[in-house]
């Protein structure tokens, strides 16, 4: 995911267009300004609220840490010091106007708070030696208490003990969590440093005595304190006193700015661009940006191209960063403190007559100095508005700091309450002040009172898997990946006219329609997801024409997926020709491609940093009048009517889409096209390759994972896109796409538009599958009931099954495809298959299918095939029912197994070996064969109770049967089953 933005940005104004949010006056060009970074409500991105720096530095409690300020390294040294002294003092009343006033007395009087921990990242830098603190190393932090003093100072434990040798490690917060081996290594360091510490303490005592600032007794008391006096002399910016490196950095910064001032005085913008071109540097940016790039190159040498994407680097946020794209889907993530530079001198254009440049060129040295930079501490910042301070973030990984409330019924809450308390976290019966997050169980109503209260109090609302992952990793995790945003506004039902739907936000849906001109339908939904920047945007573009007249409107709606509070919309009235011209202009601007290339599916190419159109097919080809389909009379049997209502219930599909976190606002009832799903599978296949193959370059692997994840979430818009980087997450996305395939079929076959005139009978006919209820006293019903009741596996204890209805099936054309295998192969069995309710319209219409070629080859123990079981509960697991929705559907299929290839452990294959027609995974528990029955003469029904098999070395608990040809399967019965969940 994108790194959280820093709360503040510091820079010199690039123009005189901004005004100060504090004093309301204009911020003149090149004036020092500070911007508070906030999420824009107008677009999907971050925007600065600019202020004069002097206005901010007069206030208290604004900037909590130097590391909270983006761009501080690019300021003049004097302005950098203003911010540092503001943070050190904790009050900004005098720092804005004085650069030389010492604030050490304030810092010295501040009480310090200390802690010790094992570093969870490699992002922090030691304030003493300026080296990185690597992941797994023990580090010590200090933090002054009091208003405004919220900056953390990190040190290697060894470096800290060299400065403060009398530290009682056992008294530090977090000492008990340090591994014994690390404790044993640290304790001798205290003992070794004690003699030197006594000398330093004596010197400090003598100095303080001469200065008259401390009495002798105070020094004695300090020896008994937890930390030596020397540690109190540290400034919040992290240094005991100006070191040689700090002085070098100051001198270098001043020299660099002298050069920038000369460039401003003597060199024009055009000459700066020419100079950058000659040196193969980027020429993009404002006059200030050009000046910065030229000064950097003149002083330190021209920058080489990015090693990952061959893009241009520039200095930003304390690092040299690449601003190019690793592919059309993703920005390049390369950044470094020590970039490669082109060998040789900085070049001056041959034709230049600029005397300053000519004079400078004669004096330039062939060997350039190296730029001195501070270690980047981007991971150790407070996150500004709505977040905890830096101290809290340093300890946020402890489960003891997690305070959880649960949304759901009492039975769902009780098990979680016990687990939360056992893990050491705190359970809150209701959301209140101090609650860290509200965890949503199951399908809790988004209008739930606790959820409304949590939103009012700005408490994070997260999914159950947040707690699962916290307990697994034994620490409090960030909420971002698990958040459930308010999607109540996103449940959009569309009003379809013609071949498309007018967006309801336009307010024109009642008396207008989408403009159609021949094969052209002027309606598109654009998507862009980039995990490296945090962008997850949509853009809707439509030409809307009045039903009675020729007037047209160009409608635009934009924002962030899953968040209706961010974005906006616009409706402009114009003539038809002007509307078409404006539509095409906007499409080209947003996608980098012409409308014709997309319409004709020729030469369309995704462009870096641009949107991608999504295929949305509303599944309707004619205009219809509004009617309630379920209220009309039907010729179907009552039990079949209830089944059809289950299959065609829009809320079932809506709930599935919500479970998958699909953006339902801009994908009305998730009508993704087959093309999008196919492209989603292709992205997952690439992710699978990256996860399974060893890569010697972790940075490149991470960038490629970001790129493939961007492709996936652009094709399949999600409320919470993230980097897919582990096997479980990957498999869940594969299952999601498999389910979406059937939702796509259901939407295309049945349609979910509210104005449909189709009755249940009409929808039933479109399934092309004859479905007949079985009488409960029939022989087939009793056999199936016995099969269900006797084959429940002993380990599946979470629920029991109750048979409600059985329907005989006859899919159109299926018997003819199956007949040759029925006669030729033999060895036929009646076997179980379970699936989500949302998959059954697709199954009844098209039969059981094998995963497509573009789907990743994972999650399939024995390859891509159709899987069956002889124990009912083995298949029932895949119905994914719950207490609120306890009724599921299951299949009994006649399967022509032929010669079986038997295995005791997983082995991927595209098809069984020569001479074999199916695969069987041998389980440790099997149905008792003496109780098997025959159906229709030669079809085996393995309806015996589970017993131990003779196979002892198998990795499988229960039998699995796999065929690799759909023609070997004939659907026979559909079962309506009630799951009686026990918890």
Curated annotation (Swiss-Prot):
Gene symbol here is PARP1
Main localization (coarse)? nucleus
Q: Name one GO cellular component term.
A: nucleus
State the reactions this protein catalyses: NAD(+) + (ADP-D-ribosyl)n-acceptor = nicotinamide + (ADP-D-ribosyl)n+1-acceptor + H(+); L-aspartyl-[protein] + NAD(+) = 4-O-(ADP-D-ribosyl)-L-aspartyl-[protein] + nicotinamide; L-glutamyl-[protein] + NAD(+) = 5-O-(ADP-D-ribosyl)-L-glutamyl-[protein] + nicotinamide
Q: Which GO terms describe its biological process?
A: DNA ADP-ribosylation; DNA repair; protein poly-ADP-ribosylation; response to abscisic acid; response to oxidative stress
One Gene Ontology MF term: NAD binding
Name of one Pfam family that matches: PARP_reg
Domain (WGR): give its ranges.
511-611
- Keywords noted in UniProt: ADP-ribosylation, DNA-binding, Glycosyltransferase, Metal-binding, NAD, Nucleotidyltransferase, Nucleus, Repeat, Transferase, Zinc, Zinc-finger
UniProt-recorded name of the protein: Poly [ADP-ribose] polymerase 1
Function, as annotated: Involved in the base excision repair (BER) pathway, by catalyzing the poly(ADP-ribosyl)ation of a limited number of acceptor proteins involved in chromatin architecture and in DNA metabolism. This modification follows DNA damages and appears as an obligatory step in a detection/signaling pathway leading to the reparation of DNA strand breaks.
Q: Which residues form the BRCT domain?
A: 394-484
**Comp. bias (Basic and acidic residues):** 215-226
Enzyme Commission code: 2.4.2.30, 2.4.2.-
> What's the top EC group for this one?
transferase
Locate the region Zinc ribbon. Answer: 301-345
Ranges for the PADR1 zinc-binding domain? 236-375
PARP catalytic domain residues are 758-983
Q: Which PROSITE patterns does its entry note?
A: BRCT, PADR1, PARP_ALPHA_HD, PARP_CATALYTIC, WGR, ZF_PARP_2
């Amino acid at each position: 995911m994108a790194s959280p933005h820093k709360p503040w940005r510091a820079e010199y104004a690039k123009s005189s267009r901004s005004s100060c949010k504090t004093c309301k006056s204009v911020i003149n060009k090149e004036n020092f300004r500070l911007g508070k970074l906030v999420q824009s409500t107008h677009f999907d991105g971050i925007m600065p609220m600019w202020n004069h720096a002097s206005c901010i530095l007069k206030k208290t409690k604004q900037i909590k840490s130097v590391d909270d300020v983006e761009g501080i390294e690019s300021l003049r040294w004097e302005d950098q010091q203003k911010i540092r002294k503001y943070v050190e003092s904790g009050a900004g009343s005098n720092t804005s106007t004085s650069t030389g006033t010492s604030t050490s007395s304030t810092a010295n009087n501040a009480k310090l708070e200390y802690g010790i921990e094992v570093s969870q990242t490699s992002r922090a830098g030691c304030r003493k030696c300026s080296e990185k603190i690597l992941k797994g190393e023990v580090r010590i932090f200090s933090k002054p208490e009091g208003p405004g003093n919220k900056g953390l100072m990190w040190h290697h434990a060894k470096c800290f003990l060299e400065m403060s040798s009398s530290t009682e490690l056992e008294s530090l917060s977090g000492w008990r969590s340090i591994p014994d081996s690390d404790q044993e290594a640290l304790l001798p360091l205290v003992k070794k440093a004690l003699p030197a510490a006594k000398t330093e303490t004596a010197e400090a005592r003598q100095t303080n005595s001469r200065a008259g600032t401390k009495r002798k007794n105070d020094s004695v008391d300090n020896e008994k304190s937890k930390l030596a006096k020397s540690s109190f002399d540290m400034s919040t910016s992290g240094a005991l006193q100006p070191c040689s490196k700090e002085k070098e950095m100051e001198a270098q910064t001043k020299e660099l700015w002298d050069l920038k001032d000369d460039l401003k005085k003597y060199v024009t913008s055009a000459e700066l661009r020419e100079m950058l071109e000659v040196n193969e540097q980027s020429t993009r940016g404002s006059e200030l940006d050009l000046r910065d790039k030229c000064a950097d190159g003149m002083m330190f040498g021209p920058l080489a191209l990015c090693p990952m994407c061959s893009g241009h680097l520039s200095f930003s946020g304390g690092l040299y960063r690449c601003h190019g794209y690793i592919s059309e889907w993703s920005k390049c993530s390369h950044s470094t403190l020590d970039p490669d530079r082109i060998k040789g001198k900085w070049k001056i254009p041959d034709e230049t007559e600029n005397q300053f440049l000519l004079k400078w060129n004669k004096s330039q040295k062939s060997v350039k100095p190296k730029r001195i930079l501070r270690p980047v501490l981007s991971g150790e910042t407070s996150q500004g508005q709505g977040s905890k301070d830096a101290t809290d973030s340093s300890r946020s990984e402890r489960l003891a700091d997690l305070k959880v409330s649960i949304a759901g019924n009492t039975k769902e809450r009780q098990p979680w309450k016990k687990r939360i308390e056992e893990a050491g976290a705190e359970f809150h019966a209701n959301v209140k002040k101090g609650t860290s997050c509200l965890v949503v169980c199951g399908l809790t109503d988004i209008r739930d009172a606790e959820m409304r209260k949590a939103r009012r109090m700005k408490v994070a609302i997260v999914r159950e898997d947040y707690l699962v992952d916290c307990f697994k990793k034994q620490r409090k995790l960030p909420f971002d990946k698990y958040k459930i945003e308010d999607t109540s506004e996103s449940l959009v039902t569309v009003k379809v006219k013609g071949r498309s739907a007018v967006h309801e936000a336009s307010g024109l849906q009642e008396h207008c329609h989408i403009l159609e001109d021949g094969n052209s339908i002027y309606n598109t939904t654009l998507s862009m997801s980039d995990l490296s920047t945090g962008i997850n945007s949509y853009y809707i573009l439509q030409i809307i024409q009045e039903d009675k007249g020729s007037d047209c409107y160009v409608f635009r709606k934009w924002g962030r997926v899953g968040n209706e509070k961010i974005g906006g919309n616009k409706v402009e009235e114009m003539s038809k020709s002007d509307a078409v011209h404006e539509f095409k202009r906007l499409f080209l601007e947003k996608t980098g491609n012409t409308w014709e290339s997309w319409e004709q599916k020729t030469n369309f190419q995704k462009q870096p940093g641009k949107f991608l159109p999504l295929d949305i097919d509303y599944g309707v080809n004619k205009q219809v009048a509004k009617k309630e389909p379920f209220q009309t009379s039907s010729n179907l049997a009552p039990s079949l009517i209830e089944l059809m209502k289950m299959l065609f219930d829009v809320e079932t599909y809506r709930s599935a889409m919500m479970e998958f976190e699909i953006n339902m606002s801009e994908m009305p009832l998730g009508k993704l096209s087959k093309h999008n799903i196919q492209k989603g599978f292709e992205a997952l296949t690439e992710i699978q390759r990256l996860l399974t193959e060893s890569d010697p370059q972790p940075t490149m692997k991470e960038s490629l994972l970001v790129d493939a994840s961007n492709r996936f979430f652009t094709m399949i818009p999600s409320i919470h896109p993230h980097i897919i980087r582990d096997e479980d997450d990957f498999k869940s996305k594969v299952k999601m796409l498999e389910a979406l395939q059937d939702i796509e079929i259901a939407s295309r076959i049945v349609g979910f538009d509210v104005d449909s005139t189709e009755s249940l009978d009409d929808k039933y006919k479109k399934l092309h599958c004859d479905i007949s209820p079985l009488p409960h006293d029939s022989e087939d019903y009793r056999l199936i009931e016995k099969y269900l009741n006797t084959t429940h596996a002993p380990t599946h204890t979470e629920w029991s099954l109750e048979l409600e209805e059985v329907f005989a099936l006859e899919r159109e054309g299926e018997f003819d495809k199956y007949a040759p295998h029925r006669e030729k192969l033999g060895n036929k069995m009646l076997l179980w298959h379970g699936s989500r309710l949302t998959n059954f319209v697709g199954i009844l219409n098209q039969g059981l299918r094998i995963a497509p070629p573009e789907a990743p080859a994972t999650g399939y123990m024995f390859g891509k095939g159709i899987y069956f079981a002889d124990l009912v509960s083995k298949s029932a697991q895949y119905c994914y029912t719950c207490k609120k929705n306890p009724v599921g559907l299951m299949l009994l299929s006649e399967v022509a197994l032929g010669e079986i290839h038997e295995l005791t452990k997983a082995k991927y294959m595209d098809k069984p070996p020569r001479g074999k027609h199916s695969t069987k995974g041998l389980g440790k528990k099997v149905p008792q064969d003496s109780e098997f029955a025959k159906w229709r003469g030669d079809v085996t029904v393995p309806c015996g109770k589970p017993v131990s098999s003779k196979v002892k070395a198998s990795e499988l608990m229960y039998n699995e049967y796999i065929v690799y040809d759909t023609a070997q399967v004939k659907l026979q019965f559909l079962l309506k089953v009630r799951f009686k969940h026990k918890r």
